[in-house]
Design a protein with these regions (language model features):
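Nudix hydrolase/Nudix homology domain
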Residues: 1, 65-70, 74, 112-113, ...
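Acidic, metal-coordinating catalytic segment for phosphate/diphosphate chemistry
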Residues: 5-46, 51-52
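Short, solvent-exposed loop/turn elements at beta->coil junctions and helix N-caps
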Residues: 7-8, 104-109
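Short beta-strand micro-motifs in enzyme catalytic cores
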Residues: 16-20, 42-44, 69, 116-120, ...
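Active-site-adjacent beta-strand/loop module that shapes the phosphate/pyrophosphate-binding cleft
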Residues: 21-26, 52, 109-131
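Conserved Nudix-box catalytic region and its N-terminal flanking loop in Nudix hydrolases
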Residues: 35-47, 52-87, 111, 129-140, ...
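The catalytic Nudix box helix
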Residues: 72-105, 120-122, 138-141, 150
Length: 183
C-alpha cells in the first residue's frame, strides 16, 4: 500500500476526518476515511485492582456517541506521562493507587481512528484511609458510576449489564469474556 494523497474533509473542535487516497499492491486507487484526534497524543487505559480483595475497578459511563452507558475501564486522553493514570483514576473513581506496570504505546481501533494509548496496571490498597470512602472528582460533562467486580463473577456481570441495555467495552470482554478460553 502506498499513500498518494490526503485531505481533511471535516475539521471539528476535538476530532477531524481525513480522506486518504492509497494505491493498492495491484495498482488500484482506494479511498479511506479516518478519524483523527486534534489535541491528544497518548491516552491511558487503566486496569485497576483493589488489593487484597482482587476486585477490579470498572466504570459505567454515559457516552453521547452511543447515546447510552458503557461498562469500561477508567481511561483518559492526552497524557504522554503514564503517571497521569493515577490522576485519572482518582478523578473518575476516587481511588488512589500505585502503578505496577505500563504497556508500550498501543493502537486501539486503527481501522477507523489514529488513537494511541498505554495500558496502565494499578494496584489500589483497600486498607489506606484514602480508599475507605473514595470521592470522585468528575468534570461537569462526565456521568460516571464506579463498579467493583470480582474476577470470578466478571463475565456474568458483563452479561447482566448487556441484558439491562448497557454496552460493554471490547477490551473488557477480552479480559473477562474470552480470556479463560485462550489462556
Amino acid at each position: 500500500m502506498k499513500k498518494i494523497n490526503e485531505k481533511t474533509v471535516y475539521d471539528g473542535k476535538w476530532l477531524g476526518v481525513r480522506e486518504t487516497l492509497y494505491q493498492t499492491r495491484e495498482g488500484k486507487e482506494l479511498s479511506w476515511e479516518c478519524v483523527f484526534r486534534k489535541r491528544s497524543t497518548v491516552g491511558v487505559v487503566i486496569v485497576a485492582r483493589l488489593m487484597p480483595s482482587k476486585r477490579f475497578i470498572l466504570i459505567k459511563q454515559y457516552r453521547p456517541a452511543i447515546d447510552g452507558y458503557i461498562i469500561a475501564l477508567p481511561a483518559g486522553l492526552g497524557f504522554n506521562d503514564p503517571d497521569h493514570a493515577l490522576v485519572e483514576l482518582k478523578e473518575e473513581t476516587g481511588y488512589a493507587g500505585k502503578i505496577v506496570d505500563v504497556s508500550p504505546v498501543l493502537k486501539s481501533g486503527a481501522s477507523l481512528i489514529d488513537d494511541n494509548a498505554r495500558i496502565v496496571y494499578i494496584e489500589v490498597d483497600e486498607a489506606l484511609p484514602a480508599n475507605q470512602n473514595p470521592v470522585q472528582e468528575l468534570e461537569d460533562a462526565e456521568d460516571i458510576q464506579v463498579l467493583l467486580v470480582e474476577p470470578e463473577n466478571a463475565k456474568k456481570f458483563l452479561l447482566d449489564q448487556i441484558s439491562k441495555g448497557n454496552h460493554i467495552a471490547a477490551n473488557l470482554w477480552y479480559m473477562f469474556g474470552i480470556n479463560q478460553l485462550i489462556a
